[in-house]
């Protein structure tokens, strides 16, 4: 499983998602992730909206194996359901 987290500096939900991904990387085989700072990379909400397929107003925006799954709360729920791991 490969997760990409699009976030920005100062975003507490981005930090939570990144921390959970780091925890999963250490505990789940074949799990890896990439954190993308949208400000540093010059990515706009419009760019993210195109990737997600609907308007994006918040970050983080999280993709699992290239499929958009939503934000931090969605990611936490999926990881708890799939692996029993919580942030």
Curated annotation (Swiss-Prot):
Extract the NCBIfam families matched here: GRXA, PRK11200.1
Chief location of this protein within or outside the cell: cytoplasm
| SUPFAM superfamilies with a match to the protein in the record | Thioredoxin-like (SSF52833)
Q: What domain of life is recorded for the organism?
A: Bacteria
Q: Which PANTHER family match?
A: GLUTAREDOXIN 1 (PTHR45694:SF28), GLUTAREDOXIN 2 (PTHR45694)
Q: Glutaredoxin domain: from which residue to which, for each copy?
A: 1-87
What protein family does this chain belong to? Belongs to the glutaredoxin family.
A GO cellular component annotated for this chain's UniProt record is: cytoplasm
| Quaternary data | Monomer.
Which subcellular locations apply to this protein? Cytoplasm
Entry protein name = Glutaredoxin
Organism for this UniProt entry: Haemophilus influenzae (strain ATCC 51907 / DSM 11121 / KW20 / Rd)
Q: Name one GO molecular function term.
A: electron transfer activity
Q: Which UniProt keywords apply?
A: Cytoplasm, Disulfide bond, Electron transport, Redox-active center, Transport
Q: Pfam families in the record, alphabetically?
A: Glutaredoxin (PF00462)
Lineage from the top down? Bacteria, Pseudomonadati, Pseudomonadota, Gammaproteobacteria, Pasteurellales
Q: Which cysteines are joined by disulfide bonds?
A: 11-14
* GO BP term (any one): cell redox homeostasis
Q: What does this chain do?
A: Has a glutathione-disulfide oxidoreductase activity in the presence of NADPH and glutathione reductase. Reduces low molecular weight disulfides and proteins.
């Amino acid at each position: 499983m490969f997760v990409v987290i699009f976030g920005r500096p100062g975003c507490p939900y981005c930090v939570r998602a990144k921390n959970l991904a780091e925890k999963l990387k250490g505990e789940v085989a074949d799990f890896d992730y990439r954190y993308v700072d949208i400000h540093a990379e010059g990515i706009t909400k419009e760019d993210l909206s195109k990737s997600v397929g609907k308007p994006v107003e918040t970050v983080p925006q999280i993709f699992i194996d290239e499929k958009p799954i939503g934000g931090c709360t969605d990611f936490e729920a999926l990881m708890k359901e799939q692996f029993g791991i919580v942030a």
